Amino acid sequence: MPMIDADGCLLNVSVEGRDGGPTLMLSNSLGCTLQMWEPQMKALTQLFRVIRYDRRGHGKSGVPAGPYSMERFGRDVLTILDDLNIEKTHWCGLSMGGMVGQWLGANAPERLNKIILANTTSKGNCVNTIQNCNHGTDKVA
């Protein structure tokens, strides 16, 4: 798996599937790694060149000091696409990955073919969400 430098943060990226096929980029939910898509890979790689990545702060990617933003996450995706010489991709984002997809759709629509937004929202406060995850679910139990 290549490591791609996005403004000093190394991002863990996986590229699998059909060479020359249409590209599908998968973006996972908060707290998950690119491995969350493993059960779908056999089917998807028969049809697509599939790009998965660990968002900064996740998995094998770097963990630079925050705060992070949707713009930062979106620009990381554009860096990955540029580094892999991909002009356009289909996008599938789950939860937070869908939020990144919305940023891309609004700010770099020329880089996307189709967008799948799964179980997502149009806004959120990443810092508060991460802090809540760090404190656990005691408040909602």
Task: Describe the function of each predicted region.
Residues 1-10:
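N-terminal cap/lid segment of alpha/beta-hydrolase-fold proteins
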Residues 9-66:
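Conserved HGGG/HGGXW glycine-rich cap/lid loop of the alpha/beta-hydrolase fold
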Residues 28-30, 89, 93-98:
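Conserved alpha/beta-hydrolase "nucleophile elbow" surrounding the catalytic nucleophile
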Residues 54, 90, 113-116:
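Residue in the alpha/beta-hydrolase core beta-strand immediately N-terminal to the catalytic nucleophile
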Residues 61, 95, 119:
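Catalytic nucleophile serine of serine hydrolases
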Residues 72-89:
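Conserved acidic catalytic loop of the alpha/beta-hydrolase fold
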Residues 73, 91-93, 118:
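Short beta-strand immediately N-terminal to the catalytic nucleophile in serine-hydrolase-like folds
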Residues 99-107, 112-141:
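Flexible "cap/lid" loop of the alpha/beta hydrolase fold
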